[in-house]
Amino acid sequence: MKKNEIMSKTKIVCTIGPASESKEMLTKLVKAGMNVMRLNFSHGTHEEHEEKINTLLEINKELSTNVAILLDTKGPEIRTGDFVGGKTSFKKGQTSVICVEDIVGTSERFTITYKDLYKDVKPGGFILVNDGQVELLVDHVEGTDIVCICANDGIVKNKRGINVPGIKLGFDYLSEKDIGDLTFGCQQGVDFIAASFVRRPQDVLDVKKLLIENGRPEIQIIAKIENSEGVENMDEILKVADGIMVARGDLGVEIPAEDVPLIQKELINKCRAAGKIVITATQMLDSMQENPRPTRAEVSDVANAIYDGTDAIMLSGESAQGKYPVEAVETMTKIALKTEGTLDYASLQRKAIRTASLDQSEAICMSVAEIASKFNVAAIVAFTDSGFTARKMSRYRTKSMIIAATPNEQTTRALAINWGVKSVLCKQMDTRAAMIEYAQVIAKENLVEPGEQIIVTAGTPGVAGTTSYLELITVK
């Protein structure tokens, strides 16, 4: 195989914003290696997001690609109100009061979007403003006012984020905005929901219920772990979510920054064991917002996330508003390809086998992985309606590429985050002979040479969630 022409197995998620929303730039990002377009619904109107979605669908059609759409919710975040002059200066030792009235505030007295915070906080706790740039120590609660002492100097602009570490907040998970955004996403055909600030399993179930009510139960829900309560409940959250995003920005404010690498590894390991997708996000190539080359620490960060076992790596400001969005994607692709070339695939496979469940589908996928390793097969062609077989195979981290052949266009995009999987749209294959014939065609289209071996695997036609067949063949 001409391996220098293969795209990375690790998937790349790109946040789309002013720097990348034109058709020309989106096309360049797709060609550079973008697998998933992330739309951040904390910003922008439905009309603006719809335009981006339609543009991507046009590009997918023109390039015969399957780039997926991820809707990232605003979530139940807390923000400051506005300040006189658009910003305010906090001084160490000053008294600062957080109130419920909607005022244009100053550092002495300002409002926030969550009006019941006074019911949740306790004296001695911290309220962190603007990603922890300003720390407010809660002194006491006076009626509905939270009286704080400022722990450091800092400048805060309008509508900055508020974090309250260690406090279980009392608000409902789904806001009216999120409900409207999720309903819009269902209508627009998005493939993934990144649910922000998930604290408990019920938050995911609330999103799932809304998707079902809107006729889109197949949309996969990625729970963003970005607060201490989410970390505490990660095992239960993982049981009901389709995957996890390690959202290191807010997480690094809510918990000690030195704990974030450990939590990242723990979340990735748990997702790998459960066969759930995992995205590592935030500040991966942050300096490339301004510079054409990453720092060496950033390169190591991306590589180490891949060594940890992440399915996908994500760009935020780098691709949304940075000066070098295409270069950032190209850099991620280069790092991923280099890192994947040094992975210990045998060790990864053994680890997957140790944590595998015992059922027929798992046994078939396990056998496929072992045969692929022993015979050094060029590709695994998985025929799948729902994506089940390809997702199962991805868990085993085979060195061989996994080609998911499906008659379902939605499934081609639903597999966009799964590590090592390339999806292609095909007609329904109901016989073994048809599958064997088509497998050879798409293998050669994906740079498999005549004489190389491939494995063909499939489930029972028309029955989702099964994998019951495998065959080793030589490409003619």
PLM regions: where:
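Non-catalytic helical/linker scaffolds that mediate oligomerization, partner binding
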Residues: 1-476
